[in-house]
């Protein structure tokens, strides 16, 4: 199992950075606490918590969670998940690298998002205004994630060293 998966946070309180989105009283934290989240797109650099936040949302809301990578998925995969989601109220579809989907692939999501069959969470490192088609973008809220600062990175590394079973066996000093 890759280190990123072994140390992935499981709650908003474990997540480092992104206080503007998930800190106490923030808009996204309130939505999660109220159990009502909109379809959304997380935009930010690699390693800022886009996938982690999506997983935390699904775990917090205890709803079915489907995950696709736009690098390898196609319209058929999207349609299969939408069909499954019709029998699973509140289902979340997380699409990593959503900017890699072409217009047709993005259009396949429209009806299901509009009807509330799925709640879409997309993740992208590219500006969604240019990479996500306007019809889909208009049905989503865009949240911008910021790079972690040096203090947060050190805290993350120290936490990994302290908690990870493999790293615990090494003599690592920061």
Predicted regions and their residues:
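Conserved RecA-like P-loop NTPase ATPase core
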Residues: 15, 42, 51, 58, ...
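Walker A/P-loop
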Residues: 1, 30-68, 82-86, 110-115
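A short hydrophobic beta-strand->loop->alpha-helix junction that borders the nucleotide-binding pocket
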Residues: 44, 66-74, 124-125, 145
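Conserved catalytic/switch belt of AAA+ P-loop NTPases
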Residues: 32, 95, 104-138
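Short glycine-rich substrate-engagement loop in P-loop NTPases that contacts/grips substrate
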Residues: 21-26, 63-95, 102-103
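Conserved AAA+ ATPase "SRH/arginine-finger" region at the nucleotide-binding site
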Residues: 69, 141-154, 173
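Short conserved motifs of the RecA-like P-loop NTPase core
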Residues: 168-174
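A short, basic N-terminal segment
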Residues: 1-34
């Amino acid at each position: 199992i890759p280190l990123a998966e072994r140390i992935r946070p499981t709650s908003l309180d474990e997540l480092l950075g992104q206080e503007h989105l998930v800190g106490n009283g923030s808009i996204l934290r309130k939505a999660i606490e109220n159990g009502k989240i909109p379809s959304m797109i997380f935009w930010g650099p690699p390693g800022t918590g886009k996938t982690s936040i999506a997983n935390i949302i699904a775990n917090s809301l205890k709803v079915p969670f489907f995950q696709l990578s736009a690098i390898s998925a196609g319209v058929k995969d999207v349609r299969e998940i939408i069909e499954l989601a019709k029998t699973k109220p509140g289902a979340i579809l997380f699409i990593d690298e959503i900017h890699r989907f072409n217009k047709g692939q993005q259009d396949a999501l429209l009806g299901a998002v509009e009807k509330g069959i799925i709640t879409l969470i997309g993740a992208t490192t590219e500006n969604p205004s240019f990479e996500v088609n306007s019809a889909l973008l208009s049905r989503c809220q865009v949240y911008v994630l910021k790079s972690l600062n040096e203090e947060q990175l050190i805290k993350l590394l120290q936490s990994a060293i302290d908690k990870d079973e493999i790293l615990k066996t090494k003599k690592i000093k920061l």
